[in-house]
Amino acid sequence: MTPIRHNHSDGDAVLDAVRDCVLAVGVRRTTMTDVARRAGVSRMTLYRRWPDVRSLVGDLMTREWVAAATGAMPERRPGTLTRDLIADGLVAGVAAFRAHPLFHKIVDVDPELLLPYVLDRRGASQEALLGLLADVLREGHADGSVRQGHVERQARALLLIVQSFALSLRTMTDADDTELNGDAFLAELRGILERTLTP
């Protein structure tokens, strides 16, 4: 798994501060001065580790998205197929991501921040998630519950599927129709993943 660049308590305090700033005013209106003040550190301390607000927000998104994904993975119980663990974890991860307040704020106020990670390149959180997926896919190959295939390609295909649900689901749902609400689409996602993974 790709490590988060600033994974220690001082960095966490700074990332907590940038999260609070972004939730309050959005990314564009967040300044290094605001973050330093909230974190109780000098601006120079911030600039030694992060060149600008965008790099801070990038590390924040990595921390938050990876935590949401790993926190959504169900506990492995005896007799549980790895395929079910993957499908259930990915569906829960999409639900957690969609409910995340930082995701809502970025989509509502600064959606252009997500475009590079959808159209141009993978970010650190995507790389970390691909690593997690590759590991669990290998387990599924070994126990026979997941269709054999090129692990990295399978991981990337799964991430493409769940990203589309996480980022675009609200454009397809109809809250007043139980057949087209968010829960119905998450059930559909579960079926897609099951069919994709089954040998």
Identify the role of each PLM range.
Residues 1-3, 92-95, 127-143, 160-161, ...:
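C-terminal peripheral helix-coil segments that are non-catalytic and often amphipathic
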Residues 1-25, 29-38, 54-58, 63-70, ...:
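Basic, helix-initiating cap at the start of DNA-binding domains
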Residues 17-21, 96, 161:
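Short amphipathic alpha-helical elements of helix-turn-helix/winged-helix folds
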Residues 40-50:
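Short hydrophobic/aromatic patch on the recognition helix
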Residues 49-50, 61, 133:
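Tryptophan-centric aromatic hotspots in well-structured domains and transmembrane helices
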Residues 59, 72-103, 155-158, 186:
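Hydrophobic alpha-helical connector segments
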Residues 69, 105-107, 116-143, 152-159:
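Amphipathic alpha-helical packing segments from all-alpha helical-bundle domains
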Residues 98-120, 167-171:
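Amphipathic alpha-helical segments used for helix-helix packing
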